[in-house]
Design a protein with these regions (language model features):
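Catalytic nucleophile loop of clan PA
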Residues: 210
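Bacterial N-terminal signal peptides that target proteins for export
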Residues: 1-14
């Protein structure tokens, strides 16, 4: 029982714990009269690498503007409206200024659950509505609370030792592969991802969503949002995989240790999934969605409750014709 408890804690640590670019443009169009476009839009000084949409925050990890991504109909996502990131616990005054002045931030969606939020509360930004949309299935939350797993950051004492110890355990390796399927098939998670999509549709200003490290649960939120906006599978996968660039140094260092200890590919993949993201597991779960629900389009409508009409309104609000 003790080992099982520790296995659960280890696997959950990661879950609690960076395309195509065209041009910078504001999203003002005749179909979006109810929405006041962000002005001024972010400049290259506020997007460190415009082709990758990385935002230079001081205290917020893994932050990206979703602008510039090309949808299947040729339109692009507007810059200055949609941001994905890690938690806002250490957001600095300069970070807040960017979110207020450049993004006109009105809404933050937090995919973490109550214990995570109580251990590491977001910085409160004046005028912003915070909405909790926990997308960790309840059965995993209960296990995590029972065994007292923390936020799962690599800076937590002993976390690296635990990761290295269980990287070689086939049972844990297999458990990691099941995390994404559990999330996308859980009714509570589906309901909250649907709530997130409707929140993005209804937002009066810029929107930011995050979990702990901004990679797994936020990655799925971004995937569903991009799918609703009309992105191809390739664009969705590439955006999800970009989080690996944010954590590449840590992944490479720990993977090297695993190889030095004669660990096989299963152990290396475990480190990749826990510290970065497993794009392999992500794609396998996209396949699962197609197999179990018919298609991503049907999943959005039937599981997340986001209709075709909702999707058309979302596209009118956040897409613009390419220059």
């Amino acid at each position: 029982m003790a080992k099982k408890s520790f296995l659960v804690k280890t696997v959950l640590m990661s879950m609690l714990t960076a395309v195509t670019f065209t041009s910078f443009a504001s999203c003002s169009n005749d179909d979006d009269m109810a929405y006041e476009p962000v002005s001024p839009v972010p400049t290259r000084e506020h997007v460190a690498d415009s082709s990758q949409r990385v935002i230079k925050f001081e205290g917020v990890d893994n932050a990206r503007d979703m602008g510039g991504l090309v949808m299947q109909d040729g339109r692009t996502v507007c810059f200055g409206k949609l941001v994905r990131s890690g938690k806002l616990v250490k957001a600095t005054d300069a970070d807040v200024a960017i979110l207020q002045d450049r993004y006109h931030l009105s809404d933050v969606f937090d995919f973490r659950f109550a214990l995570e939020m109580s251990e590491a509360s977001d910085r409160v930004i004046s005028g912003v509505t915070y909405t909790q949309v926990s997308t960790m299935p309840q059965k995993l939350i209960e296990l995590q609370e029972k065994f007292g797993a923390g936020s799962g950051q690599l800076s937590t004492p002993g976390t690296i030792d635990v990761l290295m110890k269980y990287a070689f355990d086939p049972e844990v390796q297999e458990m990691v592969k099941q995390l994404y399927p559990i999330i996308v098939t859980d009714p509570q998670s589906q309901a909250n991802y649907g709530k997130f999509l409707h929140g993005v549709l209804d937002a009066k200003g810029g929107v930011l969503w995050h979990c702990s490290e901004g990679k797994d649960r936020s990655g799925w939120g971004s995937a569903f949002l991009l799918a609703a906006l009309g992105a191809s599978r390739q664009v969705i996968v590439e955006d999800f995989d970009k989080s690996n660039e944010s954590y590449a140094t840590e992944v490479e260092a720990l993977s090297a240790q695993v190889r030095d200890m004669k660990g096989g590919e299963g152990a290396v993949e475990f480190i990749q999934a826990m510290v970065g993201v497993s794009t392999k597991n992500f794609e396998a779960t996209l396949d699962l969605i197609d197999q179990q629900y018919g298609s991503m389009e049907q999943y959005l409508e039937n599981q997340l409750g986001f209709s075709k009409e909702d999707q058309n309104l979302l596209r009118a609000k956040y897409l613009i014709a390419a220059n």
